[in-house]
Amino acid sequence: MWVGERITEKGIGNGISIVLVINIISRLPQDLSNLFEQFVFGKAPATAILAVVIIFAIIIAMVVLVIILNDGVRKIPVQYAKKMQGRKMVGGQTSNIPLKVNTSGVIPIIFAQSIMQFPIIICSFIGYNGTGVWAEILKGLNSGYWCKPSQPIYSLGLLLYIVLIVFFAYFYTSITFNPLMIADNMKKQGGFIPGIRPGKPTSDYLNKILNYIVFIGAIGLIIVSVIPYFFNGVFGASVSFGGTSLIIIV
């Protein structure tokens, strides 16, 4: 924290973010080493080359997806009616309401992970490993057991994780973006969306578009966050570099 604050004070950038990025990037060489050791080294030349191509293709695809999530915007056109102020005609301007594809950022993933890990942390703190059904529930909440072909039942925890991501994507967006307030402000300022009546119809229209965009963003977050678990579970890879890390870096 202290180092991050000093970086911010010197004007280099957001200190905390820079520290997080450095910490995340420092794990990349080890993750790549683990992947190459498992899928490339000791394999036939053709198999090794194919593995390298697939690994880097997946990495590039994830980076592109995260960039789209972070920078993708749906612009809703807004037009302002002309009106007389004194002897001058004012208004008639055009603007837009930018709706980001990933309105909630990395928050849904962080909240979902925190909720999934909370029971495990509490049990670990009190020294309780669980017995019977509770032990199975704890395994289902542990991402280390997800996507394993030999233990498919524990992947139900992954389904819960996905549901939580979708829930928090909508929940966080509903807190930070209020279509009704925006529609009221537009109406007061003489603004309107072409083809949509001011007031509640505008609010309903914005809410409809927002729900669609949030769903797309949530699907993107799910893909980015689940891929590392899939590789770790199905192929036994040791990848600590997750979707959260990639979103923070980009």
Kindly label every feature range from the protein language model.
Residues 1-250:
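N-terminal cationic and glycine-rich segments that engage phosphates or anionic surfaces
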